[in-house]
UniProtKB/Swiss-Prot annotation:
<feature type="region of interest" description="Disordered">
    <location>
        <begin position="41"/>
        <end position="75"/>
    </location>
</feature>
<keyword id="KW-0472">Membrane</keyword>
<comment type="subunit">
    <text>The Tat system comprises two distinct complexes: a TatABC complex, containing multiple copies of TatA, TatB and TatC subunits, and a separate TatA complex, containing only TatA subunits. Substrates initially bind to the TatABC complex, which probably triggers association of the separate TatA complex to form the active translocon.</text>
</comment>
<dbReference type="Pfam" id="PF02416">
    <property type="entry name" value="TatA_B_E"/>
</dbReference>
<keyword id="KW-1003">Cell membrane</keyword>
<keyword id="KW-0811">Translocation</keyword>
<dbReference type="GO" id="GO:0043953">
    <property type="term" value="P:protein transport by the Tat complex"/>
</dbReference>
<dbReference type="InterPro" id="IPR006312">
    <property type="entry name" value="TatA/E"/>
</dbReference>
<keyword id="KW-1133">Transmembrane helix</keyword>
<dbReference type="GO" id="GO:0008320">
    <property type="term" value="F:protein transmembrane transporter activity"/>
</dbReference>
<keyword id="KW-0997">Cell inner membrane</keyword>
<keyword id="KW-0653">Protein transport</keyword>
<feature type="compositionally biased region" description="Basic and acidic residues">
    <location>
        <begin position="66"/>
        <end position="75"/>
    </location>
</feature>
<comment type="similarity">
    <text>Belongs to the TatA/E family.</text>
</comment>
<dbReference type="InterPro" id="IPR003369">
    <property type="entry name" value="TatA/B/E"/>
</dbReference>
<feature type="transmembrane region" description="Helical">
    <location>
        <begin position="1"/>
        <end position="21"/>
    </location>
</feature>
<keyword id="KW-0813">Transport</keyword>
Length: 75
């Protein structure tokens, strides 16, 4: 009851007739470029987060040490 291979081939043929192969090639390359750009921005964001996490941990440790020093002076 689903879409058969023949129906898909007919739809593909109609699309090629309407748009032409050159325009479809341009659309495909534009879509590929957009996907590559999206993947690159996602990987850049992950690298940024990976760099930021050690800095946050280091800042938390320094803050904890700074809070411990006044306690030592009081005691």
């Amino acid at each position: 009851m689903g879409i058969s291979i023949w129906q898909l081939l007919i739809v593909l043929g109609i699309v090629i007739l309407l748009f032409g192969t050159k325009k479809l090639r341009n659309i495909g390359s534009d879509l590929g470029g957009a996907i590559r750009g999206f993947k690159k921005s996602m990987s850049d964001e992950e690298e940024k987060n990976a760099e930021q996490q050690p800095l946050e941990k280091q800042n938390a440790e320094q803050q904890a040490q700074a809070e411990d020093k006044p306690k030592e002076k009081q005691g």
